[in-house]
A protein has these predicted regions:
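Aromatic-rich, lipid-facing transmembrane alpha helices and their immediate juxtamembrane interface loops
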Residues: 1-171
Length: 171
């Protein structure tokens, strides 16, 4: 039951994060994700390694998505301003929520580097394509290049989050 609540809470918050920018309400998603975070920690307890994982990947994920935006292959709606190219708050919120899946609904992937790499390389581009379809992001240039970038980024990011999680749990 906890795993189901975990994935449903993330999915609802993910939708709010992606739809919010397309309806000119970019902060509704981060608010929904904050509610998910608070509910998660009140339901599951405040484990320090999980809190650290959320903080690390909120920062790292924002940097990763900012670098992808700087590549010129994608732009985000609901940004802070047109002059500043930093991944928007709703992206940071999604990274926070995604980190909460690692020890719960996606715990089955722990210790499975190759499976995490393949899953990330496939699911990452699909999730971003869904975001484009809902108006949260726009792709520019050759779609093969965009897909390759997203596959590489997520093929590396998913195993990385499990590796970091493992190190945090060992402390």
């Amino acid at each position: 039951m906890k795993k189901l609540v975990n994935i449903l809470g993330f999915k609802i918050s993910w939708w709010a994060c992606v739809v919010g920018p397309s309806i000119d309400m970019p902060y509704i998603g981060p608010a929904a994700m904050l509610i998910f975070l608070l509910a998660h920690f009140s339901f599951n307890g405040m484990e320090s390694s999980e809190i650290k994982l959320v903080i690390i990947f909120s920062i790292l994920g924002t940097v990763i998505d900012t670098l992808m935006a700087l590549s010129g292959l994608l732009t985000y709606n609901g940004t802070y301003s047109n002059e500043i190219v930093v991944a928007p708050l709703w992206i940071t919120a999604m990274w926070c929520g995604f980190a909460l899946l690692v020890n719960h609904s996606m715990a089955w992937l722990e210790g499975k580097f190759f499976q995490a790499l393949i899953l990330g390389a496939v699911i990452g581009p699909i999730a971003y394509k869904a975001g484009e379809g809902l108006g949260a992001i726009s792709f520019h240039g050759n779609m093969l290049h965009v897909t390759m970038m997203l596959s590489i980024v997520w093929g590396l990011s998913l195993p990385l989050i499990y590796w970091v999680n493992d190190r945090l749990k060992q402390r």
